[in-house]
Amino acid sequence: MANSTSSGSRAPALSGAGPVMIIGGAEDKLRDRVILARFVQLAGGRDGHVVVVSTASSLGDEATGLYRELFLHLGVGRVSGLRPVTRDEANDPAAGRLMDTATGVFMTGGNQLRLASVVGGTELGAALLRAHERGAVIAGTSAGASAVSTHMMAFGASGASPKHRMAQISAGLGILTNVVVDQHFEQRTRLGRLLSVVSQSPSLIGLGLDEDTAAVIFANQTLEVIGRGAVTIVDGSEIVTDSYQTKGHRPMMVSGAILHSLPGGYRFDLKSRTLLAGPAEAIGKVPRAVETARRRLHRLSREIAAEGADSFVVDRKDRKARELPEASE
Protein backbone atom coordinates (compact mmCIF):
# COMPACT_ATOMS: atom_id res chain seq x y z
CA MET A 1 0.00 0.00 0.00
CA ALA A 2 2.74 2.47 0.96
CA ASN A 3 5.88 3.10 -1.04
CA SER A 4 8.48 5.84 -1.38
CA THR A 5 11.33 6.92 -3.59
CA SER A 6 13.87 7.47 -0.82
CA SER A 7 14.56 6.36 2.72
CA GLY A 8 14.30 8.30 5.95
CA SER A 9 11.72 8.51 8.71
CA ARG A 10 12.63 11.59 10.77
CA ALA A 11 9.67 13.91 11.31
CA PRO A 12 10.11 17.31 9.61
CA ALA A 13 10.73 20.41 11.69
CA LEU A 14 7.49 22.34 11.21
CA SER A 15 5.39 24.47 13.54
CA GLY A 16 1.82 25.76 13.50
CA ALA A 17 -1.09 24.77 11.28
CA GLY A 18 -0.02 24.39 7.66
CA PRO A 19 -1.68 25.82 4.56
CA VAL A 20 -4.46 24.00 2.74
CA MET A 21 -4.53 24.00 -1.06
CA ILE A 22 -7.80 23.06 -2.75
CA ILE A 23 -7.72 22.64 -6.54
CA GLY A 24 -10.71 22.61 -8.89
CA GLY A 25 -9.40 19.67 -10.92
CA ALA A 26 -7.63 19.37 -14.30
CA GLU A 27 -4.84 21.52 -12.90
CA ASP A 28 -2.09 23.09 -14.96
CA LYS A 29 -3.43 22.86 -18.50
CA LEU A 30 -1.49 25.90 -19.71
CA ARG A 31 2.20 26.04 -20.57
CA ASP A 32 3.10 27.98 -17.42
CA ARG A 33 1.61 25.65 -14.82
CA VAL A 34 1.96 27.31 -11.45
CA ILE A 35 -0.34 25.39 -9.11
CA LEU A 36 1.75 22.26 -8.56
CA ALA A 37 4.92 24.34 -8.41
CA ARG A 38 3.37 26.38 -5.60
CA PHE A 39 2.45 23.17 -3.78
CA VAL A 40 6.05 21.96 -4.06
CA GLN A 41 7.27 25.30 -2.73
CA LEU A 42 4.93 25.10 0.26
CA ALA A 43 5.98 21.49 0.90
CA GLY A 44 9.62 22.47 1.31
CA GLY A 45 11.07 21.79 -2.13
CA ARG A 46 14.32 19.82 -1.97
CA ASP A 47 13.95 19.36 1.79
CA GLY A 48 10.35 18.21 1.52
CA HIS A 49 8.61 14.85 1.70
CA VAL A 50 5.35 14.64 -0.25
CA VAL A 51 2.86 11.82 0.32
CA VAL A 52 0.45 11.23 -2.57
CA VAL A 53 -2.88 9.72 -1.45
CA SER A 54 -4.71 8.24 -4.44
CA THR A 55 -7.54 6.38 -2.70
CA ALA A 56 -10.21 8.47 -4.45
CA SER A 57 -9.35 7.18 -7.91
CA SER A 58 -9.72 3.75 -9.50
CA LEU A 59 -6.63 4.79 -11.47
CA GLY A 60 -4.82 5.31 -8.18
CA ASP A 61 -1.57 3.44 -8.81
CA GLU A 62 -1.04 5.13 -12.16
CA ALA A 63 -1.95 8.51 -10.71
CA THR A 64 0.51 8.02 -7.86
CA GLY A 65 3.30 7.18 -10.29
CA LEU A 66 2.72 10.19 -12.49
CA TYR A 67 2.43 12.63 -9.59
CA ARG A 68 5.58 11.15 -8.09
CA GLU A 69 7.45 11.70 -11.35
CA LEU A 70 6.17 15.24 -11.63
CA PHE A 71 6.94 16.26 -8.05
CA LEU A 72 10.45 14.82 -8.26
CA HIS A 73 11.07 16.83 -11.44
CA LEU A 74 9.75 19.91 -9.67
CA GLY A 75 12.40 19.43 -7.00
CA VAL A 76 10.82 17.56 -4.09
CA GLY A 77 13.42 15.59 -2.15
CA ARG A 78 11.22 12.58 -1.42
CA VAL A 79 7.85 11.37 -2.72
CA SER A 80 5.82 8.49 -1.25
CA GLY A 81 2.53 6.93 -2.24
CA LEU A 82 -0.39 5.72 -0.12
CA ARG A 83 -3.47 4.04 -1.54
CA PRO A 84 -5.53 2.29 1.11
CA VAL A 85 -8.67 0.81 -0.40
CA THR A 86 -10.14 -0.59 2.83
CA ARG A 87 -10.48 0.83 6.32
CA ASP A 88 -8.22 -1.92 7.64
CA GLU A 89 -5.47 -0.67 5.35
CA ALA A 90 -6.11 2.93 6.44
CA ASN A 91 -5.73 1.77 10.06
CA ASP A 92 -2.33 0.21 9.35
CA PRO A 93 0.12 1.89 11.78
CA ALA A 94 2.70 2.02 8.98
CA ALA A 95 0.45 4.38 7.02
CA GLY A 96 0.20 6.71 9.99
CA ARG A 97 3.96 6.61 10.54
CA LEU A 98 4.61 7.51 6.91
CA MET A 99 2.17 10.42 7.11
CA ASP A 100 3.94 11.63 10.26
CA THR A 101 7.07 12.31 8.16
CA ALA A 102 5.28 14.32 5.46
CA THR A 103 5.81 18.02 4.80
CA GLY A 104 3.15 17.92 2.08
CA VAL A 105 0.14 15.71 1.30
CA PHE A 106 -1.50 15.59 -2.12
CA MET A 107 -4.87 13.86 -2.54
CA THR A 108 -5.85 12.98 -6.10
CA GLY A 109 -9.22 13.24 -7.81
CA GLY A 110 -11.78 10.52 -8.40
CA ASN A 111 -14.63 9.88 -5.96
CA GLN A 112 -14.69 11.85 -2.71
CA LEU A 113 -17.10 9.42 -1.06
CA ARG A 114 -14.56 6.65 -1.57
CA LEU A 115 -11.81 8.78 -0.05
CA ALA A 116 -13.83 9.95 2.95
CA SER A 117 -15.39 6.57 3.71
CA VAL A 118 -12.04 4.74 3.57
CA VAL A 119 -9.82 7.31 5.34
CA GLY A 120 -12.19 9.22 7.64
CA GLY A 121 -12.00 8.17 11.29
CA THR A 122 -8.95 5.92 10.80
CA GLU A 123 -5.32 6.10 11.89
CA LEU A 124 -4.45 7.57 8.50
CA GLY A 125 -7.20 10.17 8.89
CA ALA A 126 -5.87 11.12 12.32
CA ALA A 127 -2.32 11.30 10.96
CA LEU A 128 -3.55 13.59 8.19
CA LEU A 129 -4.97 15.97 10.80
CA ARG A 130 -1.72 15.78 12.78
CA ALA A 131 0.26 16.64 9.66
CA HIS A 132 -1.87 19.72 9.09
CA GLU A 133 -1.62 20.81 12.74
CA ARG A 134 2.19 20.62 12.77
CA GLY A 135 2.57 22.66 9.57
CA ALA A 136 2.45 20.36 6.55
CA VAL A 137 0.64 21.64 3.46
CA ILE A 138 -2.46 19.58 2.67
CA ALA A 139 -3.62 19.66 -0.95
CA GLY A 140 -6.47 18.03 -2.81
CA THR A 141 -7.53 18.22 -6.43
CA SER A 142 -11.07 17.64 -7.68
CA ALA A 143 -12.56 14.98 -5.36
CA GLY A 144 -9.56 15.43 -3.07
CA ALA A 145 -10.48 19.10 -2.69
CA SER A 146 -14.09 18.37 -1.74
CA ALA A 147 -13.01 15.84 0.89
CA VAL A 148 -10.79 18.33 2.75
CA SER A 149 -13.65 20.04 4.60
CA THR A 150 -15.70 18.79 7.55
CA HIS A 151 -18.90 19.24 5.52
CA MET A 152 -18.27 17.54 2.17
CA MET A 153 -20.18 18.03 -1.07
CA ALA A 154 -20.80 14.36 -1.77
CA PHE A 155 -22.74 14.59 -5.03
CA GLY A 156 -25.50 16.57 -6.70
CA ALA A 157 -27.06 17.97 -9.85
CA SER A 158 -25.78 20.70 -12.15
CA GLY A 159 -27.52 23.98 -12.91
CA ALA A 160 -27.30 27.69 -12.17
CA SER A 161 -30.51 27.91 -10.10
CA PRO A 162 -30.66 26.48 -6.56
CA LYS A 163 -33.21 23.73 -6.03
CA HIS A 164 -34.34 21.62 -3.12
CA ARG A 165 -32.44 18.32 -2.78
CA MET A 166 -29.93 19.51 -5.37
CA ALA A 167 -26.90 18.34 -3.39
CA GLN A 168 -26.00 15.79 -0.75
CA ILE A 169 -23.65 16.65 2.12
CA SER A 170 -21.70 14.06 4.10
CA ALA A 171 -18.76 14.05 6.49
CA GLY A 172 -15.37 14.89 5.01
CA LEU A 173 -11.87 14.65 6.48
CA GLY A 174 -12.22 17.64 8.80
CA ILE A 175 -9.21 19.75 7.83
CA LEU A 176 -11.29 22.84 6.97
CA THR A 177 -14.20 23.36 9.33
CA ASN A 178 -16.05 26.47 8.15
CA VAL A 179 -16.39 25.92 4.40
CA VAL A 180 -17.96 23.62 1.84
CA VAL A 181 -15.97 23.02 -1.35
CA ASP A 182 -17.16 22.32 -4.89
CA GLN A 183 -14.90 21.80 -7.91
CA HIS A 184 -15.03 21.80 -11.74
CA PHE A 185 -17.26 24.72 -10.83
CA GLU A 186 -17.72 26.78 -14.00
CA GLN A 187 -17.14 23.83 -16.32
CA ARG A 188 -19.99 21.78 -14.82
CA THR A 189 -22.35 24.64 -13.88
CA ARG A 190 -22.39 24.01 -10.14
CA LEU A 191 -23.44 27.42 -8.80
CA GLY A 192 -26.97 26.23 -8.07
CA ARG A 193 -25.97 23.38 -5.82
CA LEU A 194 -23.45 25.49 -3.89
CA LEU A 195 -26.11 28.17 -3.33
CA SER A 196 -28.56 25.52 -2.16
CA VAL A 197 -26.09 24.14 0.40
CA VAL A 198 -25.12 27.56 1.75
CA SER A 199 -28.76 28.66 1.98
CA GLN A 200 -29.49 25.61 4.14
CA SER A 201 -26.28 26.02 6.19
CA PRO A 202 -25.50 29.76 6.13
CA SER A 203 -22.70 29.46 8.70
CA LEU A 204 -20.64 27.75 5.99
CA ILE A 205 -18.75 29.67 3.31
CA GLY A 206 -19.17 28.14 -0.13
CA LEU A 207 -16.03 27.84 -2.26
CA GLY A 208 -16.48 26.98 -5.95
CA LEU A 209 -13.23 26.21 -7.76
CA ASP A 210 -12.87 26.36 -11.53
CA GLU A 211 -10.61 23.86 -13.26
CA ASP A 212 -6.88 24.68 -13.26
CA THR A 213 -7.53 27.01 -10.34
CA ALA A 214 -6.59 26.69 -6.68
CA ALA A 215 -7.28 28.42 -3.40
CA VAL A 216 -4.54 28.37 -0.77
CA ILE A 217 -5.89 28.91 2.74
CA PHE A 218 -3.39 29.89 5.41
CA ALA A 219 -3.60 29.55 9.20
CA ASN A 220 -4.71 33.19 9.55
CA GLN A 221 -7.74 32.39 7.34
CA THR A 222 -6.40 34.32 4.36
CA LEU A 223 -7.34 32.72 1.04
CA GLU A 224 -5.15 33.28 -2.03
CA VAL A 225 -6.25 32.37 -5.58
CA ILE A 226 -3.86 30.95 -8.17
CA GLY A 227 -4.44 29.56 -11.65
CA ARG A 228 -6.21 30.51 -14.84
CA GLY A 229 -9.83 30.44 -13.65
CA ALA A 230 -11.67 31.90 -10.69
CA VAL A 231 -12.79 30.97 -7.20
CA THR A 232 -16.43 31.76 -6.44
CA ILE A 233 -17.10 32.56 -2.79
CA VAL A 234 -20.67 32.35 -1.48
CA ASP A 235 -21.28 34.18 1.81
CA GLY A 236 -24.66 33.34 3.34
CA SER A 237 -24.40 35.51 6.45
CA GLU A 238 -27.22 37.78 5.21
CA ILE A 239 -29.16 35.19 3.24
CA VAL A 240 -32.95 34.88 3.20
CA THR A 241 -34.44 31.64 1.88
CA ASP A 242 -37.50 29.42 1.82
CA SER A 243 -35.37 26.26 1.62
CA TYR A 244 -37.06 24.81 4.70
CA GLN A 245 -40.45 25.06 2.97
CA THR A 246 -39.53 23.92 -0.54
CA LYS A 247 -40.49 20.36 -1.42
CA GLY A 248 -39.36 17.83 -3.98
CA HIS A 249 -36.83 19.18 -6.44
CA ARG A 250 -38.46 22.57 -6.88
CA PRO A 251 -36.51 25.85 -7.16
CA MET A 252 -35.65 27.58 -3.89
CA MET A 253 -35.97 31.27 -3.11
CA VAL A 254 -32.54 32.64 -2.21
CA SER A 255 -31.99 36.35 -1.56
CA GLY A 256 -29.16 38.30 0.03
CA ALA A 257 -26.37 35.86 -0.78
CA ILE A 258 -23.07 37.69 -1.20
CA LEU A 259 -21.01 36.42 -4.13
CA HIS A 260 -17.35 37.09 -4.85
CA SER A 261 -15.61 35.91 -8.03
CA LEU A 262 -11.84 36.11 -7.62
CA PRO A 263 -9.33 35.36 -10.41
CA GLY A 264 -5.71 34.42 -9.82
CA GLY A 265 -3.70 36.72 -7.57
CA TYR A 266 -6.54 38.00 -5.41
CA ARG A 267 -6.88 37.36 -1.69
CA PHE A 268 -9.84 37.07 0.65
CA ASP A 269 -10.16 37.09 4.45
CA LEU A 270 -12.40 34.16 5.39
CA LYS A 271 -12.62 35.35 9.00
CA SER A 272 -14.05 38.79 8.21
CA ARG A 273 -15.50 37.65 4.86
CA THR A 274 -13.92 40.60 3.04
CA LEU A 275 -11.76 41.12 -0.02
CA LEU A 276 -8.16 42.10 0.72
CA ALA A 277 -6.72 44.99 -1.27
CA GLY A 278 -4.21 44.14 -3.99
CA PRO A 279 -3.45 40.84 -5.73
CA ALA A 280 -0.78 38.53 -4.38
CA GLU A 281 2.55 38.28 -6.17
CA ALA A 282 2.59 35.51 -8.78
CA ILE A 283 5.08 32.67 -8.58
CA GLY A 284 7.63 32.27 -11.36
CA LYS A 285 7.52 29.99 -14.38
CA VAL A 286 7.96 26.24 -14.12
CA PRO A 287 11.16 24.76 -15.65
CA ARG A 288 10.82 23.21 -19.10
CA ALA A 289 12.29 19.94 -17.82
CA VAL A 290 8.91 18.94 -16.41
CA GLU A 291 6.93 19.50 -19.64
CA THR A 292 6.74 15.82 -20.67
CA ALA A 293 5.66 14.68 -17.21
CA ARG A 294 3.07 17.43 -17.03
CA ARG A 295 1.57 16.46 -20.39
CA ARG A 296 1.20 12.88 -19.20
CA LEU A 297 -0.30 14.11 -15.95
CA HIS A 298 -2.74 16.32 -17.83
CA ARG A 299 -4.01 13.35 -19.85
CA LEU A 300 -4.44 11.34 -16.67
CA SER A 301 -6.11 14.23 -14.83
CA ARG A 302 -8.71 14.41 -17.60
CA GLU A 303 -9.39 10.68 -17.15
CA ILE A 304 -9.69 11.10 -13.38
CA ALA A 305 -11.98 14.10 -13.83
CA ALA A 306 -14.15 12.08 -16.21
CA GLU A 307 -14.17 9.20 -13.74
CA GLY A 308 -15.63 11.50 -11.11
CA ALA A 309 -18.23 13.26 -13.27
CA ASP A 310 -21.86 13.18 -12.24
CA SER A 311 -23.60 10.88 -14.72
CA PHE A 312 -26.17 13.52 -15.62
CA VAL A 313 -23.60 16.32 -16.06
CA VAL A 314 -21.30 14.62 -18.56
CA ASP A 315 -20.58 16.77 -21.58
CA ARG A 316 -22.05 15.50 -24.85
CA LYS A 317 -18.64 15.45 -26.46
CA ASP A 318 -17.31 13.26 -23.65
CA ARG A 319 -20.26 10.93 -24.09
CA LYS A 320 -19.40 10.43 -27.73
CA ALA A 321 -15.71 9.97 -26.96
CA ARG A 322 -16.01 7.37 -24.22
CA GLU A 323 -18.39 5.55 -21.90
CA LEU A 324 -18.04 7.17 -18.46
CA PRO A 325 -18.55 5.21 -15.21
CA GLU A 326 -20.72 6.60 -12.45
CA ALA A 327 -19.02 8.41 -9.59
CA SER A 328 -19.96 10.95 -6.96
CA GLU A 329 -17.56 13.85 -7.47
What are these regions (language model features)?
Residues 113-114, 145-148, 232-233:
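Short gly/pro/ser/thr-enriched loop/turn and capping motifs at secondary-structure boundaries
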Residues 97-101, 121-135:
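Catalytic-core regions built around general acid/base machinery
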